[in-house]
Every structure is written in structure tokens, then in C-alpha cells.
Amino acid sequence: MESVLNRCCTIGLPLCKIVLVNDGLVFKLIFISMGYEMAATYSTMMPLGTEAPDFNLFDSVTGLQLSLQTLRGNKATLIIFICNHCPYVLHVKEQLIAIAEQYLPKGVSTIAISSNDIVAYPQDAPDKMRALSAEWGNPFDAYLFDQSQAVAKAYQAACTPDFFLFDSELKCVYRGRLDAATPKNNLSVTGDELRNALDALLSGTPVNPEQIPSIGCNIKWQAL
């Protein structure tokens, strides 16, 4: 609890009230300031060294079923859980595009996955995913739809965006935030923390295990 509160104080929002809600998986922070309210969820931090769970999902861009084994990179595989409408994702989209494009020639495959419930959030449906990918210039190796949400659960994904970097053997070396920027703290979006992990991995240098959880909108889980 204390560590969560400490993080609240460092993300740069002008807080006047903090409400913690324990949903059994993660703490959700509700920030209320000057009439502004936003629910934020932290990533659950998959244990380092975990092997990437396999999957076979529908690619919204090509219309094909694609597996992790088909999409994995020669040097590294970056999996990002995103969705179309999330303000946290839209805030960092330029860096998401840049990282995918800049690291592809270095042997890094970048796979985006959307796991949101499209009944409640139709703007995240596959046809809308395909349109967004085209608008962004189709930067990812795939933009996959996790209809059953089983893949998000296998990766312990909790928020959008949620980042998972795996080495050439598909072992997790980084799970955490892109950088310190959020939609409300006015920090520049640089992607430096994820870039540092990518650069270390590609250079053969150990990735710093001190990693900070990502923060974003919660994945929109289907009603039970």
C-alpha cells in the first residue's frame, strides 16, 4: 500500500484527493483535482525471466491468425497491450510508432495487442483497430485482437499501455513503463526507460532490473 501511495506522489498530477480501490488484482487510483477525475491502473509486473506465453490471435491489419512463433523477432520481441481509445496510449503514440520503426531493422519485433471488451467499447473492435493502424502508418508487426482476453491474463497485463520485452529466447527482461510522462504531468514523452532496456539487450548488457510499473487505463474486462 505504501509503495503505491509513494508512486502516486511522483507521477506529476495535481492531487487533492486519492482513493484506493483494491479490485483483487491491482490497486486502482482515482485522482480528483479541480473537477478532473481519472482512474489509473498500474501494471502487475510479470516476474523477470518468465517465458512469453504463446498465442495465436487475429491480426486486425492482415486478417490472418498469427502466432507468437511466427511474429517473434530474431533479437528481441516487444509486446505492448494497447487500445484505440485510451488517452494514455494516445499520449505516447509518437514514441510507440518511433520505437517500432527504429528497432525493427535491429531485429526487434513489436506486437501490439488489444484485449478490451468490444461489446462495452465498440471503438476498440477489429475494424477500428485496422483503421487506427493505417492512420499510424501500420508501424507494428501486427495489431492483434485478443477476443477471449486469455492472452492478457496469461501475460498478467492490467493496463494500457502495458509493455513486455523478451530476449531472443523469449525470456522477459523488461516489464514496466515507457518513461515518466503521463497525460497530465507535462513531461516530454521520450520513451527513455524502454529504449534503455532495448539498447542494453541488443548490446549484450544486462538490463537494469530496477523497473517502474506502467500506468494507464485498466483493460476493459468482459462481464462475468
Question: Which residues does each PLM region occupy?
Answer:
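Cysteine-centered motifs
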Residues: C8-C9, C16
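N-terminal compositionally biased or targeting/leader segments
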Residues: I11, F27-K28, L64
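Mature cores of small secreted peptide/protein domains
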Residues: L13-P14, V21, H91, Q222
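Short, Lys/Arg-enriched N-terminal segments with co-localized hydrophobic residues
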Residues: L15-E37
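Chalcogenol-based redox active-site neighborhoods
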Residues: M34-Q211, N218-L224
